[in-house]
């Protein structure tokens, strides 16, 4: 991973356009090819980013060089580097990834087997659908064929909603999947998390773990 602290301006050019005026920012260039731009006031969420596969090149600008990050669809993240204050590279090795606790892993398995709990006509596309920022628990399609990303938690809190929001922002950049809606599924969801999810257009679903454990893999068991 390469970490660069620089005075820079940033322009996103693609289906949408966005401009960040000159400021000191952290630029992260990861080994998977992704590039993200961070400020000091947004926790872990980048100001803008480009997901892999993409290519980073440098153009000679006047008066400053321009880093051009381009993805396979031709969208560009153009970073005009006015001054570099820090530039270092680090080999972090292979990360083992986030390991879900036993209950969350079992909830994911059960919901994948009984995807109809999400709604009539839902079908499973894939469990652990990989993205540049981690795996989405379930990627499904609703009764109309539209993509739905499902994040599963034992306890639904604000950080889980934020995590799903990041997945949705990324998935909706994929023209083969967009539009992608979200479902936040948990055994219990805190009021603040539900409010945030509703505000972002994410549907909340309460999972009854005991009932789901009483289901066979191919039919409901009544008890």
From Swiss-Prot:
It is found in: Cytoplasm. It comes from the Bacteria. GO terms for molecular function: DNA binding; single-stranded DNA endodeoxyribonuclease activity. Pfam families: NucS_C, NucS_N. Its EC number is 3.1.-.-. Keywords: Cytoplasm, DNA-binding, Endonuclease, Hydrolase, Nuclease. GO terms for cellular component: cytoplasm. Its main location: cytoplasm. CDD domains: NucS-like (cd22341). The keyword Cell inner membrane does not apply. Cleaves both 3' and 5' ssDNA extremities of branched DNA structures. Belongs to the NucS endonuclease family. This is Endonuclease NucS. It comes from Mycobacterium sp. (strain JLS).
């Amino acid at each position: 991973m390469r970490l660069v602290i620089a005075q820079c301006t940033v322009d996103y050019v693609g289906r949408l356009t966005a401009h960040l005026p000159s400021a000191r920012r952290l630029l992260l260039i990861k080994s998977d090819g992704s590039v993200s731009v961070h400020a000091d006031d947004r926790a872990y969420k980048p100001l803008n980013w480009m997901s892999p596969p993409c290519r980073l090149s440098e153009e000679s600008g006047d008066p400053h060089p321009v880093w051009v990050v381009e993805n396979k669809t031709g969208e560009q993240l153009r970073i005009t580097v006015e001054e570099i204050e820090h530039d270092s590279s680090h080999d972090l090795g292979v990360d083992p990834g986030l390991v879900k606790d036993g209950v969350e892993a079992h909830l994911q398995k059960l919901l994948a087997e009984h995807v109809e709990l999400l709604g009539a006509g839902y079908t499973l596309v894939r469990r652990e659908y990989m993205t540049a920022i981690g795996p989405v628990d379930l990627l499904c399609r609703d009764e109309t064929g539209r993509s739905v990303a499902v994040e599963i938690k034992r306890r639904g809190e604000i950080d889980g909603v934020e995590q799903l929001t990041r997945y949705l922002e990324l998935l909706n950049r994929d023209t083969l999947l967009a539009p992608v809606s979200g479902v936040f599924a948990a055994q219990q969801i805190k009021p603040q998390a539900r409010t945030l999810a509703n505000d972002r257009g994410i549907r909340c679903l309460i999972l009854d773990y005991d009932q789901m454990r009483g289901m066979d893999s191919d039919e409901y068991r009544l008890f």
